[in-house]
């Protein structure tokens, strides 16, 4: 069997189209995943989840009392006190809702932290192929919404990479000495300024290698979206081979293109590490 370069040149436009699709999915997925991962990582790192039995019991009591008051108000409004103006009943309802908001507002960070940990556990514990199949085939049945292949692939990569980036962010933040956080508090800085000006720059330098590795993994994971027919690089290679039966040439070209893309990421990573290192 002879190696035919002409098969590669003939397929080159389709391979470039697949490469561009791969780059789009990867870039959009990583941008969205970085936002999700950064928020989840910060919440998981700085918000403790455990709730004491005492606070839980008081919360249940307050919730039960609020529900009872609302039901009592509805019964009185329809029966014995039907002549009371509606404004009075609405004022009572708003007061009860304000009480609930006051009691449970402090629980919002705890709920977010718990949900973030569940999200990370579920996504890291399931294959990305299962995730994209669920989003592309099962989710439209649940919400009655049509999702195209490109959107399903991009959203899946966002969700998948976000879980891993959250762990990268958590590890980076926890690697920073606690003394820096305490120093920021001693200076009277709010949390967001401590994170942005003191802890963030130090943690970011330590996260660069693992973030670069995650970028490469996400790029290669995009090839798995072949299962839903997205016209990325691997899918294009498969369709080309179905037409010309030149598997050696086409898969070789596909492999070289992936190596070039991952090599560019590695070079960019080395440049960023060089620019951000502390001399």
Describe the residue ranges of each PLM region:
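Transmembrane alpha-helices and adjacent helix-loop boundaries
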Residues: 1-279
């Amino acid at each position: 069997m002879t190696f035919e370069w002409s098969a590669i040149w003939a397929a080159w436009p389709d391979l470039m189209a697949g490469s561009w699709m791969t780059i789009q999915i990867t870039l959009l997925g990583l941008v969205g995943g970085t936002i999700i991962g950064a928020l989840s990582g910060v919440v998981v790192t700085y918000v403790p989840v455990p709730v004491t039995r005492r606070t839980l019991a008081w919360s249940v009591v307050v919730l039960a009392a609020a529900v009872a008051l609302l039901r009592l108000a509805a019964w009185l409004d329809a029966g014995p006190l039907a002549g009371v103006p509606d404004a009075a009943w609405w004022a009572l309802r708003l007061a009860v809702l304000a009480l609930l908001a006051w009691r449970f507002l402090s629980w919002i960070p705890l709920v977010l932290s718990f949900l973030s940990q569940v999200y990370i556990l579920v996504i890291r514990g399931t294959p990305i192929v299962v995730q994209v199949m669920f989003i592309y085939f099962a989710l439209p049945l649940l919400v009655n919404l049509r999702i195209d292949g490109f959107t399903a692939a991009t959203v899946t990569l966002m969700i998948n990479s976000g879980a891993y980036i959250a762990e990268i962010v958590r590890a980076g933040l926890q690697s920073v000495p606690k003394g820096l956080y305490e120093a920021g508090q001693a200076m009277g800085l709010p949390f967001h300024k401590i994170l942005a000006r003191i802890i963030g720059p130090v943690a970011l330098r330590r996260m660069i290698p693992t973030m670069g590795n995650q970028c490469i993994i996400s790029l290669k994971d995009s090839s798995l979206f072949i299962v839903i027919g997205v016209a990325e690089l691997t899918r294009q290679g498969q369709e080309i081979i179905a037409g010309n039966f030149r598997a050696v040439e086409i898969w070789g070209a596909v492999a070289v293109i992936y190596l070039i893309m991952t090599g560019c990421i590695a070079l960019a990573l080395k440049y960023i590490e060089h620019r951000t290192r502390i001399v």
